[in-house]
C-alpha cells in the first residue's frame, strides 16, 4: 500500500487491515491448520483417523532420532500443505472473478469505474486473496513441549509420547501414566 492508503485503513473481517474503498480482496479463502500438519508429521504423513496420506512423511514420531529430524519432517509437511492451500486460494480467486460478478460493490470501490472493470477483474487498486492460518499457537506450543520434554530434558521417550497420543492420554497403566504425560 502507499503510505496514504496504509494510514486510511479499517479492519476487514476479524484481522485484516485494509485501505478503505480501494481493495477487492477475499479474506480467509482457505484455513490451513498447522496443528493438523503437526499431527500428520507425527504419523508419517497419514491422518490417524482416516488413514489417508497425501504427502509421504519422514517417518513416525518414534523414528525421529533428533529434534532436527522432526523439524525437517514438519517443514516437509507444512510446505506441501501450504503449497496446496495457495493453489486452492488461486482457484477460489479465479472462480470469484469468472463466476460471481459484483457490479454494485464495484461501483463504490475506487478505480473500478475509471478502469472500466469489476472489482474482481482488476478494477480495484489492490486485489489479493489470503488464507487465515489456524492452530499456529497450539502447534508452536506442542513443538516447544516436544523439544523440551523429549529431546532436551528426556523426561519421556518418543515411544511413551506416541502411546499417550494414540490413547488420548487415557492409559493409566503406563509409567508415567497418560494423565501424567498430559500435565
Predicted regions and their residues:
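Conserved catalytic cores of very large enzyme subunits
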Residues: 1-183
Amino acid at each position: 500500500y502507499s503510505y496514504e492508503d496504509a494510514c486510511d485503513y479499517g479492519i476487514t473481517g476479524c484481522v485484516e487491515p485494509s485501505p478503505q474503498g480501494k481493495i477487492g480482496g477475499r479474506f480467509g479463502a482457505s484455513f490451513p491448520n498447522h496443528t493438523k500438519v503437526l499431527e500428520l508429521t507425527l504419523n508419517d504423513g497419514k491422518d490417524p483417523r482416516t488413514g489417508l496420506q497425501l504427502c509421504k512423511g519422514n517417518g513416525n514420531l518414534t523414528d525421529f532420532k533428533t529434534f532436527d529430524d522432526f523439524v525437517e519432517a514438519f517443514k516437509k509437511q507444512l510446505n506441501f500443505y501450504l503449497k496446496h492451500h495457495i493453489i486452492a486460494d488461486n482457484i477460489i480467486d479465479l472462480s470469484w472473478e469468472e463466476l460471481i460478478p459484483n457490479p454494485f460493490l464495484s461501483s463504490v470501490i475506487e478505480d473500478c469505474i475509471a478502469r472500466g472493470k469489476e472489482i474482481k477483474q482488476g478494477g480495484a487498486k489492490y486485489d489479493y486473496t489470503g488464507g487465515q492460518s489456524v492452530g499456529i499457537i497450539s502447534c508452536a506450543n506442542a513443538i516447544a513441549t516436544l523439544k523440551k520434554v523429549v529431546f532436551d530434558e528426556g523426561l519421556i521417550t518418543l515411544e511413551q509420547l506416541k502411546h499417550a497420543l494414540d490413547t488420548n492420554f487415557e492409559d493409566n497403566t503406563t509409567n508415567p501414566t497418560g494423565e501424567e504425560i498430559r500435565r
